[in-house]
Amino acid sequence: MGKNYKSLDSVVASDFIALGITSEVAETLHGRLAEIVCNYGAATPQTWINIANHILSPDLPFSLHQMLFYGCYKDFGPAPPAWIPDPEKVKSTNLGALLEKRGKEFLGVKYKDPISSFSHFQEFSVRNPEVYWRTVLMDEMKISFSKDPECILRRDDINNPGGSEWLPGGYLNSAKNCLNVNSNKKLNDTMIVWRDEGNDDLPLNKLTLDQLRKRVWLVGYALEEMGLEKGCAIAIDMPMHVDAVVIYLAIVLAGYVVVSIADSFSAPEISTRLRLSKAKAIFTQDHIIRGKKRIPLYSRVVEAKSPMAIVIPCSGSNIGAELRDGDISWDYFLERAKEFKNCEFTAREQPVDAYTNILFSSGTTGEPKAIPWTQATPLKAAADGWSHLDIRKGDVIVWPTNLGWMMGPWLVYASLLNGASIALYNGSPLVSGFAKFVQDAKVTMLGVVPSIVRSWKSTNCVSGYDWSTIRCFSSSGEASNVDEYLWLMGRANYKPVIEMCGGTEIGGAFSAGSFLQAQSLSSFSSQCMGCTLYILDKNGYPMPKNKPGIGELALGPVMFGASKTLLNGNHHDVYFKGMPTLNGEVLRRHGDIFELTSNGYYHAHGRADDTMNIGGIKISSIEIERVCNEVDDRVFETTAIGVPPLGGGPEQLVIFFVLKDSNDTTIDLNQLRLSFNLGLQKKLNPLFKVTRVVPLSSLPRTATNKIMRRVLRQQFSHFE
């Protein structure tokens, strides 16, 4: 890293001027840099932190940010820290305050302080689930049960992989807990804040807890008027706006099961999910508004031959489509329960293992896995938010997502169960209106996926907006890019990016960053609380703990909130069959390639089936893509696949690419191929060679934004 940049003690004022900074400002900034280098050296983490705090700002050229970051860490090695926790500020975080109060009780003589004792506490959370989860769920998050569980964890059948029973005997309703008044939430607290695209100069819309409760109760009564059997499935297929959140909570509150369907899905994909879930009704919208476009949604639901639909207008009160016989409008649906307006709805308390939500994995071939969330899964989602993202009362959380995949429900529970506000922008997150919404809503945690950040950096649409209220960013969904996330941190005065890696079947994350640890870009600093990771060697057995290495990831089978069933598959075969045993327990399959670096950070290298063998060297697509994405400024993004030649032999490396300007006809494919070769041979391995480059208008992606390399491998013959 940073080999092409000067070390900081060699930087002079003219280097600032060469980046377009005026001579007067350059002299001032160089003076500050010289003072920092004198006090902290030219290449230490403290040097960088002082540069981030006292020199850099969002309005300075990003090339200056790069020069100083990469120059500071020129010879550092893997995973240099981009953010370091402040020992005093840590004490006010959720985990820091807990450890200050009870650290010695939990860890005894091992406890020193929240920062140096964090890894010991993570291990404690795995070894002592009874203490850890009781503390977090009951004492800290104030989760209430109508019938208390007999214990936190029962392990009657140790020979049954993943067969642990969490909170046995307990009854609760996770939606009711979102609406409860407790020390984290008061009736006049703002719980949802939102704005519609196009209304970017209008005041924000807000719902207090009192108002949210009344809306959810009314929908709960209206659901009961439909006469559906308790426990049946009801689908939601619409953008994630305030009504969608109200409907989601009401379905769970009333004892039904949400079926999550993304609003981007085609009619066949909608039909598949309705069939697998056996949904009895569906909430949807007539159209989706994106800028000046109206994208039909209800017509896709009709084409999917859905059960009865309740249809919400995308704007105003009139539905912009003719309804099928048996379908009803949102207004009529609510009108049937008008006599119960403002009346409290009695939540249906359920056993912990009762289903609340059916979600679907983003499969690239075949039928998607139908994964049920129970009443426990929302608690896992919220606990990750509490411990790793430090979500708490007074926070404002925005994450561009949809109830059709796991980050939608995750956002609902991680915010509301921790007393934070959900911030919703009803429109595209790729426009300046979204950046203004982040500013106006005073967002404290901004969730992203890397492709959104790439677009922001490319278009500079966030320029000029004040993001100083942000305490952290969070990222999930796909591997991120160091340079792009350095740029992102710079938009909010170098607040940390807390990376998270998990899955729908986990209900949250198994690896993440933490406010109690130094954060490195595109890295995970820890195993999640209550989780254990294992990296398998080439023979399929776990490597020694804390030994640096790379291989397929396996998970400890005892994970709070993780799935135990699939509606359309054999859960044991998918997650446990053929996995190694450690200490008498069969490990759980995940399928990612993970790396543990020499300084203790985890890196994700994509799916195990996204690795290739180039010249006898096994490497992940993501490692190749990270290099290729930086080769040519005209290239927006790339993806790499290995293709065996006809007749057999070593895999050939093929790079698909998308241009920033789709109308650019000046690109020379052979020259680009040579540029990719040069970059790969310089940064990865001198034996790597790109055989073909293929232009595309866009990369095929799943609904959760993962690149479908498998599809490209299948389609490559067409390019031939």
Curated annotation (Swiss-Prot):
Pathway: Secondary metabolite biosynthesis; terpenoid biosynthesis. The record marks 609 as: Hinge residue important for conformational flexibility. The keyword DNA repair does not apply. Inhibitied by high CoA concentrations. Optimum pH is 9. Its EC number is 6.2.1.-. Keywords: ATP-binding, Cytoplasm, Fatty acid metabolism, Ligase, Lipid metabolism, Magnesium, Membrane, Nucleotide-binding, Transmembrane, Transmembrane helix. It is a single-pass membrane protein. InterPro entries: AMP-bd_C_sf, AMP-binding_CS, AMP-dep_synth/lig_dom, ANL_N_sf. Accumulates in glandular trichomes, especially in female flowers. Present at low levels in roots, stems and leaves. It is found in: Cytoplasm, Cytosol; Membrane. It comes from the Eukaryota. Optimum temperature is 40 degrees Celsius. Pfam families: AMP-binding (PF00501). This is Hexanoyl-CoA synthase. It comes from Cannabis sativa. The gene is AAE1.
